[in-house]
Amino acid sequence: MEEGALDFGLTREVLSRAGDVPVRVIPSYRDYPFPFRPWPALLSWGKRRLFLVPYAGRFFRNCPGTTRYLCCGYRIFHFGEGCPLDCSYCILQAYFNRPGLKLWANLWEEGWPELEAALNEARRDNRILRIGTGEFADSLALEHLCGVAEELIRRWVELPAPAVLELKTKVALREDWLRRLPADPRIVFAWSLNARTITRKEERGSASLEERLSSAARAARSGFSVAFHFDPVILFPETLEAYLEVVDRIFATVPAERIVWISLGALRFMPDLKEVAEERLPETRIFTGEFVTGLDGKRRYFRPLRTEAFRRLCRRIREHAPEVCVYLCMESPEVWREALGFVPAERGGLPRMLDEAARRVCGL
């Protein structure tokens, strides 16, 4: 941890939970003498190191979408960077230029006032906010060390704002942890889902499909809302049917009326990611398909492949739950039209679609 992080509440919380984990105080993360290794090896080294650092930027911000594709209007409460899980497709491998898991030590003293002000403003204006913590980190993978999600939930229930907090994760919920939380349908526990073979081979350290769905069912029974994100959908000849089976498992396990939304997004990646991921994880085969460069500079599957996958997944979801909000992540209006049969502009725009889903399911 940085010397400047010692006096903050989150630092004290992490130290109280760290047990026998070795702790070092360093002058500066920026000037830390990282091992002299190639970037892929340094990334792997960083998966086992947690840095507590005071953050100097904005904690509450807009999702880093792109003007080239339709964005959902998501807002981010930025609590840290990096993830101890090791998914071969993770964009963070090519996004940051320094290794290690990072938590912002000054989150509660300086970050929470930013978020609280936004929540109070939304309450005054009767304006819905959809906020998440899982853009640059898994929302719950470090919860046993930091307690950030639990503290956020407890603060959330004290503020009657028209806002949902979405906690995106690939880990399972501990039953004792879930039982001690104050239930609130404005809290959305969300799981990234994939075909079983992808989860097993490409999402190292994550919970199994069954563990994620069981956690979702427990969260729904406990009074929370849930969501699912099929992102990235990875297309091999055998995987589309496997994704449809996952849809069936969702609705066999989780009550549809507690699902606020389901997103669909196909594998896309910055060109640099392929080289880094294949060097770190040589057994991966997700980059062996045919890709084209999209409008955002990322590599994507050809449009007909994406639209067919989205069309079939959406059709299966609709067979189970016609009312559940389904949306595409980072796709053009043309793909929406071909895959889902409409464009969000016809329904007031994608942000409005999601706001209405939150109003209906989360009790806003």
Regions found by a protein language model. Name each.
Residues 1-45:
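N-terminal alpha-helical interaction blocks
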Residues 51-69, 91-190:
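Conserved Radical SAM active-site core
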Residues 83, 87-90:
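Short cysteine clusters
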Residues 136-141, 172-175, 187-206, 232-236, ...:
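Conserved radical SAM core fold
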Residues 238-253:
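Catalytic cores of alpha/beta
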